[in-house]
Amino acid sequence: MSRVLHPFVLAALLAILAPCVAGATGAFNQFVGLGDSTLDSGYFRYTSTGNASADAMVASAIVGGAQGGWAGPGVMTTTFLAARFGLSAETVSAGGTNFANGSAYTAPLSATAGGSAAPGGLSGNVTTTQQIANLLAATGGVANAHALYVVNSGNNDLIFVQNQGTAWIAANPTFLNGVASEFAASVATLQAAGARTIMVPNTFYTSTLTGSGGIVPASNIDDYARAVAYGMTKWSYLMAAGVRFIPADLTSVFQFVATNPALFGFTPSSVLSANAPSPVAALVTTWADITPVQLQTSLFVDGHHLTTAGQKIESDYETSLLTAPSLMSLLAEAPVQGGLARAAVIQGQIDLSGQHRGPTGVNVWIGGGVGALTLKNFSGFPDVSGTPFTGSAGVDYQMPFGLIVGAAFTAGTQTQHFSIGGGQFDQNDQAISLYSAYQAGPVWGNVVASYGWYQDKIARDVTLGLFTDSNSADTTGSSLALALRAGGDIHLGPVTTGPVAGLVLQRVRIRGFAESGTSGAQTGSNGVTALSFGEQIRDSAISQLGWRASIDAGRWRPFVEAKWNHELVDQSGRKVRAALTSATAAPYSMAAAPVQSDWATASAGTSYKISERVMVRGCASATAFDSQMVNYGGDVGVSVSF
């Protein structure tokens, strides 16, 4: 009897362990910042500016509360962004991997051909292109493929050109194009060395040029247009160089902030660079120059650099660009789990119909189920969790020689809530299935082929500081599935037990779609955080190997099954494509949420014979040993023979 009880005990153990899963791994294991003061988290706190007087001012400011970065005593966007993924944005001058240093140019700049070129506004600056070279030199020419690289450079290039005057600008119309070319070539070397996730913002410098209500004064129109064009040029040159990067449209985001200040806790005057509270540069701004309240209620510290509130808006936006594609990948993952559940229900009804068959050979059945499904993401990325509901109905016929053929219809619905940031997706699905089964002595087998279609309604909230931009979209999808299952029965008195093996093949297709957001009503576009997503295809081939047992106890027939599942299709290379809707830029791709390749499933239940023609069946199941998923639930059904 111990051999019979073994699968029951194993199944119960798996069910108990099912909710106990480990956390997901991180998408990134390092943060690397490259650029200027927009990213600098404290470079000159630990090294010289190249000017003794400036060094003394920095040292004094640190005593007064300054952090060494360019938000005064506030927090930099790099610190926020890295911390979101459990990483450090410590400056390279203190042993970290944030190479950015305030006042740096993209490349050495000179106003005259052949003239002495400067690395930035400070003699101690290191240009962005040199930062990349220094990084690769320090790593032996190999870039960390699992790092998050943010390359933000160009504001100081714009100021350099602006300071040369109208005549010089007219005489050197392609000057910034040349700088952009050097920038693109440098970032291309970073990618060639192995970097895979590279974010490149355009600029928020445009918001230092706007007046009340976000309107650009006539005196700043040329400078504003130049800043916008420079951002587009850098992206264009990166595309031409074959660099795969994530474009961050800070220009549109901060233009939206400037025109809607109240949404972010600002006033029409406190978003103006001219009204920045600090009388000194952000690098040396202390608590004597700015208050904690002003760091939250003003957009700029000193007219050029963002306060803590502004830095948080930027990091929130950039976080959304990084996490949205993998979050949307779960639109295709939920149907895979639904397909497994659908196949299991139909296979259970095949088993039930085999226990009673009327003189006509026809059985009709109906059933329904409810479960709990949590799909996990990378750490720091949103997970989803919800309650799937399903209902199925079918009819089958047993031919004189024993072959069973049947058809079923299944419908389901679920709302999957996002764990971070708010939002959800509602997924409705329908499927038509054809199935067949046959048993020859102790050996049995069945096959279920299904075609399904899906309707998704997505609501994705993006937090930008105090404001939440609610994006929404609708899309549809389809699936093909083939479930094969076979086994052998060993009869030990009232007990029937034996091995079971299966293979479930699925292809899920989710059509591409574009979001529209709350901010779109003010901008006349889709919105500043709205994205479009490309078509997704999720292929799955899951092998199953296990053992089952049942006991014939009169009208009751309790059963249990435990099996090991293995995903044969490598999911590590699956990516989801996304694109900005607020600006013209190349689409980018991010890895889909990770999927466990091995896990266990346990199920237990019973059938009950109400009469010679009517039987009912109930089953509960759960998964275990899957760090990326929590899945459990139950279903009940009734079968009538004719």
Which role does the model predict for each range below?
Residues 23-357, 370-378, 636:
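Conserved active-site regions of diverse hydrolases
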Residues 10, 79, 83, 97, ...:
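N-terminal, well-ordered alpha-helical segments
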Residues 1-9:
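Bacterial N-terminal signal peptides that target proteins for export
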Residues 17, 340-348, 564, 620:
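Short, Φ-rich (hydrophobic/aromatic) sequence segments
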